[in-house]
């Protein structure tokens, strides 16, 4: 009993971080939860972000999405130079709303099949909210590279867009995309009806 209580306490005090390794999800670490009060963003940004996520996770919101036949998911874009707090913001939101984090590392070697496997392999059997993180999306979906034909990506834009549109997302997915420079990204990714908040 004491051991089970210790495990439960550990889970309550930490955020589980999973990492996709080409074919499967592996737990990368458990990081201490970070109080929302320690998150410092530009004026109004923290309140706007937390209100959006809070509203998304409400049962009434889920019911509304499903009543209109819409995929129940939310996509948020965070952008800024390395070291500006994108990862910290995601960890803090995960802490505040008691979510697991599932990180998909974006590389030119990531295939369509691997991306679909990543989304379909997220554990939704537990009564646990989850955040999916697609990091540095601008590193492979760069509009200038696509114009020149230099992207050489195994992951196609069409598959990524299907993931963002919710067709391969688990129900209730809160998805964060990060980018160093949102201005270089393909406009098909950042159009307003695909990104709920940026």
Residues of each region from the PLM?
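Walker A/P-loop NTP-binding motif of AAA+ ATPase domains
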Residues: 44-198
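AAA+ P-loop ATPase mechanoenzymes
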Residues: 1-63, 72-74, 107-110
């Amino acid at each position: 009993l004491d051991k089970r209580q210790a495990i439960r306490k550990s889970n309550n005090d930490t955020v589980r971080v999973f990492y996709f390794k080409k074919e499967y999800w592996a737990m990368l670490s458990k990081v201490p939860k970070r109080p929302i009060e320690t998150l410092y963003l530009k004026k109004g940004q923290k309140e706007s972000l937390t209100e959006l996520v809070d509203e998304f996770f409400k049962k009434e919101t889920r019911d509304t999405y499903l009543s209109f036949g819409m995929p129940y998911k939310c996509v948020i874009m965070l952008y800024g130079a390395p070291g500006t707090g994108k990862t910290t913001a995601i960890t803090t939101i995960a802490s505040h709303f008691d979510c697991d984090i599932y990180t998909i590392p974006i590389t030119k070697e990531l295939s369509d099949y691997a991306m679909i496997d990543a989304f379909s392999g997220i554990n939704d059997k537990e009564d646990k909210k989850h955040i999916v993180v697609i990091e540095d999306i601008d590193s492979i979906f760069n509009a200038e590279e696509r114009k020149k034909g230099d992207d050489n990506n195994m992951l196609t834009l069409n598959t990524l867009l299907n993931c963002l549109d919710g067709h391969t997302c688990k129900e209730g997915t809160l998805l964060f995309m990060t980018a160093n420079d949102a201005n270089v990204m393909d406009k098909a990714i950042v159009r307003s009806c695909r990104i709920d908040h940026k």
